[in-house]
């Protein structure tokens, strides 16, 4: 017998004699899976083991990546969760919270996956993802003009259901992307092209059902007004899991009117600089039924401007308003398209009228995935023509970045900044979204696009809000600050930018409802004990 064979035999005999108590401990994912399976109460009609995906599950990566909306995080390098719980029952949420706390795992809550910097499905330490896509019911009461919508429902599903149930005479003020999940979109504010008429989504939310850090199911009455205040604009993921929202539906006319006018540079009779300057004068002051978004981009060293609008009424009334307030744009009858409000959802996606059925907004998986970076700003004073020319020059040198100017005013200026946790109200003319998209992998391309975004962002600093330089929570931007140790000092860096003076109230509420800071992530609200 050779020496190697003898050694192998000895090792084998030794291993066979080891007591079972010395066997390898179960993996963390096994312990978590067992913990949630043993949790009581449970729903025998929806056993949680049918909704748990660990890294050994054959479709783990499919479930994880189905709601990754930024290809920057769609790779083998990002840390993967210990498990994904695709909750289909409230007991699944309670079990996930209880077991994550017990095992010291961080929790990431994902409804639509549109967190621009991936904070709903990424972490630097062991974590689990609570995926809400199975919880998507929408119960509409047409008599009361209200609806209960679960967090996993998309805006497209909500819009489609509301329009069908109301004979196209009701809508809801929220985002223009139908794939957004209600959970995160609403809790960060929820803005869209009816905000000048009706405010944000949170201004039309009248109740919520949540699961708190103790696993309790609460509504507005039992959670208290302070927590309900925080959920509306403060980012619910810092406080609880939102199971469902009760929304107030709003009237929409039988027909709305949309248009999109594009200009290129300053050539001939077209002067983009003058048009943008005039847009600044009127966009936040014009009729509340009219929303005109201005998007600026550049190609071939020429700035392009897009004036995309929606009027809650017919084209004749729209033209009267435009001829009186913005004749320089030159909007004419044939450029105005009348359609149902539900059809306008597709128009804002860039889909030509009549080329796709409204059911297409029910598609949950986008046809095209992209790499992206987003940032935000608020403008409170008009940018001078000299300033605009300077900005245009920088844009021609950084052509991978666009800016969308979204006008405020109207209802947005009437609601006090302390009415909800969302503080950006009166005094803001418009909000800017910086957007860089790219379509090929590689570090060099990503670095170039990120650098271009940062250069434009820095160049805009003289023209935007200051002390703090305000930011919009739903345009998640890790560059403005993050908390690695969950301290107040770290949290206030980004907290005052997102929430201004409302940040201090959010910290107090957080400290009361989640003193152990279970619900935390890189930009969560800190607790006072960390002060």
From Swiss-Prot:
<dbReference type="InterPro" id="IPR016169">
    <property type="entry name" value="FAD-bd_PCMH_sub2"/>
</dbReference>
<feature type="cross-link" description="6-(S-cysteinyl)-8alpha-(pros-histidyl)-FAD (His-Cys)">
    <location>
        <begin position="114"/>
        <end position="177"/>
    </location>
</feature>
<dbReference type="InterPro" id="IPR012951">
    <property type="entry name" value="BBE"/>
</dbReference>
<dbReference type="GO" id="GO:0005576">
    <property type="term" value="C:extracellular region"/>
</dbReference>
<dbReference type="Pfam" id="PF01565">
    <property type="entry name" value="FAD_binding_4"/>
</dbReference>
<dbReference type="Pfam" id="PF08031">
    <property type="entry name" value="BBE"/>
</dbReference>
<dbReference type="InterPro" id="IPR016167">
    <property type="entry name" value="FAD-bd_PCMH_sub1"/>
</dbReference>
<feature type="glycosylation site" description="N-linked (GlcNAc...) asparagine">
    <location>
        <position position="314"/>
    </location>
</feature>
<comment type="similarity">
    <text>Belongs to the oxygen-dependent FAD-linked oxidoreductase family.</text>
</comment>
<dbReference type="InterPro" id="IPR036318">
    <property type="entry name" value="FAD-bd_PCMH-like_sf"/>
</dbReference>
<keyword id="KW-0560">Oxidoreductase</keyword>
<keyword id="KW-0274">FAD</keyword>
<keyword id="KW-0964">Secreted</keyword>
<feature type="glycosylation site" description="N-linked (GlcNAc...) asparagine">
    <location>
        <position position="271"/>
    </location>
</feature>
<dbReference type="InterPro" id="IPR006094">
    <property type="entry name" value="Oxid_FAD_bind_N"/>
</dbReference>
<feature type="glycosylation site" description="N-linked (GlcNAc...) asparagine">
    <location>
        <position position="76"/>
    </location>
</feature>
<keyword id="KW-0732">Signal</keyword>
<feature type="glycosylation site" description="N-linked (GlcNAc...) asparagine">
    <location>
        <position position="300"/>
    </location>
</feature>
<keyword id="KW-0325">Glycoprotein</keyword>
<keyword id="KW-0547">Nucleotide-binding</keyword>
<keyword id="KW-0134">Cell wall</keyword>
<feature type="glycosylation site" description="N-linked (GlcNAc...) asparagine">
    <location>
        <position position="164"/>
    </location>
</feature>
<feature type="disulfide bond">
    <location>
        <begin position="35"/>
        <end position="99"/>
    </location>
</feature>
<feature type="domain" description="FAD-binding PCMH-type">
    <location>
        <begin position="77"/>
        <end position="252"/>
    </location>
</feature>
<dbReference type="GO" id="GO:0009505">
    <property type="term" value="C:plant-type cell wall"/>
</dbReference>
<dbReference type="InterPro" id="IPR016166">
    <property type="entry name" value="FAD-bd_PCMH"/>
</dbReference>
<dbReference type="GO" id="GO:0016491">
    <property type="term" value="F:oxidoreductase activity"/>
</dbReference>
<feature type="glycosylation site" description="N-linked (GlcNAc...) asparagine">
    <location>
        <position position="485"/>
    </location>
</feature>
<feature type="signal peptide">
    <location>
        <begin position="1"/>
        <end position="23"/>
    </location>
</feature>
<keyword id="KW-1015">Disulfide bond</keyword>
<feature type="glycosylation site" description="N-linked (GlcNAc...) asparagine">
    <location>
        <position position="400"/>
    </location>
</feature>
<dbReference type="GO" id="GO:0071949">
    <property type="term" value="F:FAD binding"/>
</dbReference>
<keyword id="KW-0285">Flavoprotein</keyword>
<protein>
    <recommendedName>
        <fullName>Berberine bridge enzyme-like 9</fullName>
        <ecNumber>1.1.1.-</ecNumber>
    </recommendedName>
</protein>
């Amino acid at each position: 017998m050779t020496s190697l064979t003898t050694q192998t035999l000895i090792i084998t005999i030794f291993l066979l004699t080891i007591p079972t108590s010395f066997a390898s401990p179960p993996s963390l994912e096994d312990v978590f899976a067992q913990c949630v399976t043993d949790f009581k109460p449970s729903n025998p009609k929806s056993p949680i083991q049918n909704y748990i995906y660990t890294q050994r599950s054959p479709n783990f990566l499919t479930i994880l990546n189905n709601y990754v909306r930024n290809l920057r995080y769609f790779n083998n390098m990002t840390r993967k969760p210990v498990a994904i719980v695709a909750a289909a029952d409230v007991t699944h949420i309670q079990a996930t919270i209880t077991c994550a706390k017990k095992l010291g795992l961080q929790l990431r809550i994902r409804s639509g996956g549109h967190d621009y910097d991936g904070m709903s499905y990424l972490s630097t330490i062991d974590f689990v993802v609570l995926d809400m896509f199975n919880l998507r019911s929408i119960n509409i009461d047409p008599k009361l003009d209200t609806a209960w919508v679960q967090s996993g429902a998309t805006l497209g599903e909500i819009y489609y259901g509301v329009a069908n149930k109301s004979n196209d005479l009701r809508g809801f003020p929220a985002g223009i992307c139908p794939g957004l999940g209600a959970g995160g979109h609403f809790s960060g504010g929820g803005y869209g092209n009816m905000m000048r008429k009706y405010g944000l989504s949170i201004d039309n939310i009248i109740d919520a059902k949540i699961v708190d850090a103790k696993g309790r199911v609460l509504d507005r009455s039992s959670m208290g007004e302070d927590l309900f205040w925080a959920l509306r604009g403060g980012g619910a993921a810092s406080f609880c899991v939102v199971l469902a929202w009760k929304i107030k539906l709003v009237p929409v006319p039988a027909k709305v009117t949309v248009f999109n006018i594009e200009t290129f540079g300053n050539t001939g009779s077209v002067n983009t600089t003058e048009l943008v300057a005039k847009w600044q004068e009127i966009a936040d002051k014009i009729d509340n039924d009219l929303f005109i978004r201005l998007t600026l981009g550049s190609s071939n060293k020429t700035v392009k401007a897009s004036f995309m609008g929606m009027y809650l009424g017919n084209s004749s009334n729209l033209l009267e308003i435009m001829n009186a307030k913005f004749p320089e744009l030159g909007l004419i009858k044939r450029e105005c398209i009348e359609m149902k409000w539900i059809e306008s959802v597709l128009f804002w996606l860039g889909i030509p009228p009549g080329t796709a059925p409204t059911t297409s907004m029910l598609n949950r998986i986008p046809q095209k995935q992209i790499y992206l970076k987003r940032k935000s700003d608020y403008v409170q004073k008009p940018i001078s023509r000299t300033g605009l020319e300077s900005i245009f020059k920088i844009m021609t040198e950084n052509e991978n970045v666009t800016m969308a100017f979204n006008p405020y005013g109207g209802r947005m200026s009437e609601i006090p900044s302390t009415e909800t946790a969302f503080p950006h109200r009166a005094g803001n003319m418009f909000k800017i979204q910086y957007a860089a998209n790219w379509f090929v992998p590689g570090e060099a391309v990503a670095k170039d696009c990120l650098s271009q975004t940062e250069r434009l962002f820095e160049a805009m600093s003289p023209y935007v809000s200051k002390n703090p330089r305000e930011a919009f929570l739903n345009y998640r931007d890790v560059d403005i600050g993050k908390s690695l140790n969950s301290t107040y000092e770290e949290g206030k860096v980004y907290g005052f930018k997102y929430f201004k003076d409302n940040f201090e109230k959010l910290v107090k509420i957080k400290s009361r409802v989640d003193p152990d800071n279970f619900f935390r992530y890189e930009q969560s609200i800190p607790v006072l004990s960390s002060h």
